[in-house]
Design a protein with these regions (language model features):
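Short glycine/proline- and aromatic-enriched beta-strand/turn motifs that initiate or cap beta-hairpins
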Residues: 18-61
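Hydrophobic, lipid-facing positions within transmembrane beta-strands of outer-membrane proteins
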Residues: 23, 35-39, 54-58, 92-98, ...
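Transmembrane beta-barrel strands of outer-membrane/channel proteins
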Residues: 41-45, 72-76, 117-123, 159-165, ...
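Outer-membrane pore/translocation modules
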Residues: 78-175, 222, 262, 271-280
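Outer membrane beta-barrel transmembrane domains
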Residues: 182-280
């Protein structure tokens, strides 16, 4: 599938989008307000010299408190291009994630320092196999992570990481995945608008992910490890309870086993609707 695209909700970072000022690819600290539902879907793609992979994914999130959000994702994959395992990008796993903002400190009007921890369960779906690479198990994996940063009326900075561990079954095991991200955002003063007009932000996002080798019959599968770093621009617009975000990323570092093709570009467009919104 030469130029496939993906309808997706951007996993962990969607909590940030639902909070009205989050990046597309990287991690961020905001959580849903108390009683706030968010519903997301979008378009996402990973293109390589061998083609692209597409997926359809929906995300639903709910804020139990101003600092605690629970989210669920449901994916459908189109295409069978062999790609390195990914967690910071949307894939073909069913996810449930708890986001806990354990630090929230305001220093002046419009400026705050925050830290958020993540814990989740990744359940491989029926399309999660890596055909032609290794026989994989559908045993769920566990995810833990943290992100910290600063947000003001004009500037945003976040740095974070998550680690997803998959478990062995009958000698077979999917690779564990470490991902990390650094995000800077800017909201120009002239772009600050009231809720009845579009309010825009720009982001520069750097993300990386490293996965070890597949395990089959208790033997590591050669040339299935991967470490990639991507960087690129994204944008977020807000209008009433609706948000749209989009962007692209390009590789700046790739150390990928010969089993996989190297990715040329990643791109995304995400849409979000917020229901029963309250202040933090």
């Amino acid at each position: 599938m030469k130029y496939a695209v993906v309808l997706v909700v951007i996993g962990l970072s969607l909590s940030a989008v639902a909070a009205e000022h989050g990046p597309v690819f990287g991690l961020a600290t905001p959580t849903n307000s108390k009683g706030e539902w968010s519903f997301d879907e979008g378009v996402f793609g990973r293109n390589t010299s061998l083609g692209s992979q597409a997926s359809v994914r929906e995300l639903v999130a709910y804020g139990f408190t101003p600092h605690l959000t629970l989210s669920f994702t449901l994916p459908v994959v189109v295409g069978n291009t062999p790609l390195p395992p990914t967690r910071i990008q949307p894939g073909d796993d069913f996810d449930s994630t708890v986001s806990w903002r354990f630090q929230h400190r305001a220093t002046k009007v419009g400026t705050r320092f925050e830290s958020t921890a993540f814990a989740g369960l990744a359940v491989p779906g029926p399309q999660s196999g890596f055909n032609g690479i290794a026989h994989t198990t559908n045993v769920p994996g566990t995810m833990f992570g943290v992100v910290t940063g600063m947000a003001s009326l004009s500037n945003y900075v976040w740095i974070g990481s998550t680690y997803t561990k998959f478990y062995e079954h009958n000698g077979d095991k999917r690779p564990d995945v470490l991902d990390y991200s650094l995000v800077y955002g800017y909201r120009p003063p002239k772009w600050r608008r009231p809720p009845d007009k579009w309010d825009w932000r720009l982001f520069g996002e750097l993300v990386g992910e490293r996965s070890n080798r597949f395990l089959q019959a208790n033997v590591p599968v050669a040339d299935t490890q991967a470490h990639q770093v991507f960087i690129g621009p994204t944008a977020l617009g807000i209008f009433h309870n609706y948000t749209v975000s989009f962007g692209a990323q390009f590789p700046v570092y790739q150390n990928v086993g010969t089993t996989f093709p190297k990715e040329h570009v990643r791109f995304a467009v995400n849409f979000s609707y917020l229901l029963f919104q309250h202040g933090h």
